[in-house]
From Swiss-Prot:
Entry coiled-coil feature ranges: none
Tree of life domain: Bacteria
Gene designation: atpC
Protein known as: ATP synthase epsilon chain
Topology of the protein relative to the lipid bilayer: Peripheral membrane protein
Main location: membrane
Amino acid sequence: MAATLQFDLVSPERRLASVQATEVQIPGAAGDMTAMQGHAPTITTLRPGILRAVSAEGTKAYVVTGGFAEISATGVSVLAERAVPLDEMDAKLMDQLVADASAASSVGVDKDTAEKAMSDLQAMKAAAGF
């Protein structure tokens, strides 16, 4: 049996995953990386993309817009700004996310925050194949 590490993924809305994984593929800001048991301690920021956790049950993919990943020899903890299981992502949800970002930009959110939200959604849309 392959060596495992604890993988936890949380967003402000909910905890999305807590499993023993053989590897976690992370869309890091400095490039993609794969964490496995025994990985050197690392903290990285996430870029918008697809995060994957491989476990005995198979591979589970999540669309993330950003956040942080803390990697140790025994685990990976991801704190995502926004995360959605890839299999739950559909055009209706994507349209709702775009509408939310547009609404936020029209109610006094500063320009940089609004532009980042729209940029994140564009990247999320591309990563999810929409």
